[in-house]
Design a protein with these regions (language model features):
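Intrinsically disordered, low-complexity non-transmembrane regions of multi-pass membrane transporters
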Residues: 1-30, 210-223, 399-419
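Membrane-embedded helical hairpins/re-entrant loop segments and their flanking transmembrane helices
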Residues: 3-25, 48-74, 238-307
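Interfacial segments of multi-pass membrane proteins
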Residues: 97-103, 178-179, 293-309, 313, ...
Length: 419
């Protein structure tokens, strides 16, 4: 009999009646705040990525459907089984990686890479080799790749001031004010306030351009036939898997542990693998354990009841995904400067974290090489820059930085012996 390395739940899974009994207004509020974060800036990133990659409105709507509707069910199952806040959505860094890839790969090839990434994560979760995979590449190099692929969103935020000053300026000012006033910001998240003010500015300026035909619509997701190519496998599978396992899941697991939980790493990885396969068929980038949303819902209240907020986030996400065509048409009717500002503001803290993690400690030269190669965005042999950033960054660290680390370790050991 094959024994799966899944972590055993500390208690029996919660039933719907137990979930209702454990729920409360406090957890509903934290779930609402977490959901509002997920459906603002991160959705703007999907829209910006889709526009850059030439995806149709139908493609983007199907992507959002999978990201919220399908991942919502995985969240409910995992959170009820382990009675922990385990919200699964989609990989934001992964979504950003897709944009450049779509300039020279077909959408079918990209979807093939989504499925291959899901299979890889499922194998790692079933085998228990997750930790080994997470330690394979130094964190500074991984975060340098993330900084490289996210940099464009920060630059586009600045450019939005040139294109539509009276949209970008009020959105940014409200974001800064709500961020600087944490008490108000907890009740009204900065991104939500920025979105509301931006929508008001768009309405006042008369630049809202609704599509021809009905604005309202219920989801009719597309089912895509994947195409597997070596170029897409090399370019996307390794970077996608690394961003999910190290950047997203690693962050989410660390946050949950800091808040007193014991997240089941192998089960989460396997669930992300299955989620990536299922959602990939409708065009959604890889499933992951979200860091910010889980941070919001696990920061307050009784630890043993916080799973109820995760289920509420999932239910809100299912509703949002069900009406994905409506929200997609609504957002695409906004001017590009609105999307660029919202996405850029959502990426500010992520960019800051990525730069700090890249250049704070060891492997900084490798991180710099990785960052430069990724930002240059020059494909080699038809394979995108993010993959080569990891390759050249890792080679730089192995060849040029290992002797320095060894010498530093030896000097420290000798110093300790003489004391």
């Amino acid at each position: 009999m094959i024994r799966m390395p899944f972590e055993k739940p500390a208690t029996s899974p919660a039933t719907p009646s137990q979930w209702l009994a454990d729920s409360g207004g406090h957890y509903a509020l934290s779930a609402l705040v977490g959901f509002l974060f997920a459906c603002t800036g991160p959705v703007a990133i999907i829209l910006a990525t889709g526009a850059r990659g030439g995806l149709s409105e139908s493609d983007i709507s199907s992507w959002i459907f999978g990201a919220f509707f399908l991942n919502g069910f995985f969240t409910i199952a995992l959170s009820l089984i382990y009675r922990q806040p385990l919200v699964l959505f989609w990989s934001i860094p992964g979504a950003v990686l897709v944009g450049p890839a779509l300039t020279h790969l077909s959408y079918a090839e990209v979807i093939g890479a989504f499925l291959a990434t899901g299979v890889l994560m499922l194998v790692l979760g079933l085998s228990g080799w997750v930790r080994r995979a997470m330690d394979a590449i130094p964190m500074p190099i991984v975060m340098a790749m993330v900084a490289g692929v996210f940099l464009r969103f920060g630059v586009d935020l600045v450019r939005a001031f040139r294109e539509q000053l009276w949209i970008a300026l009020p959105m940014t000012l409200v974001f800064v004010l709500l961020t600087a006033a944490p008490r108000i910001g907890r009740a009204l998240p900065p991104l939500v306030g920025s979105l509301a003010v931006g929508a008001l500015a768009v309405w006042q300026l008369g630049v809202f351009k609704p599509p021809v035909g009905a604005l309202f619509g219920i989801a009719h997701p597309n089912l895509y036939m994947p195409q597997f190519s070596w170029a897409a496998m090399f370019e996307l599978v390794v970077p996608l898997a690394i961003t999910v396992l190290v950047v997203q899941n690693g962050q989410g697991i660390a946050i949950l542990r800091a808040n007193g939980h014991q997240p089941p790493v192998n089960a989460i990885t396997a669930a992300c693998g299955i989620g990536a396969i299922v959602t990939g068929l409708v065009g959604t980038v890889s499933t992951c354990l979200t860091g910010p949303v889980n941070a919001l819902i696990s920061a307050t209240g009784e630890k043993q009841r916080q799973y109820t907020a995760a289920v509420m986030v999932a239910l809100l996400g299912i509703g949002f995904g069900l009406f994905a065509p409506f929200f997609t048409r609504l957002m695409l009717a906004m001017p590009p400067a609105f999307i660029a500002t919202l996405a850029g503001l959502a990426m500010l803290r992520v960019l800051q974290t990525a730069f700090v993690a890249s250049f704070r400690d060891h492997s900084t030269l490798g991180a710099l090489v990785c960052f430069l190669v990724t930002v240059a965005d020059v494909p080699i042999f038809g394979i995108g820059a993010a993959f080569w950033g990891l390759v050249f960054g890792l080679l730089t660290t192995r060849v040029l930085e290992r002797p320095a680390r060894t010498a530093a370790a030896s000097a420290a050991a000798e110093s300790a012996q003489t004391k």
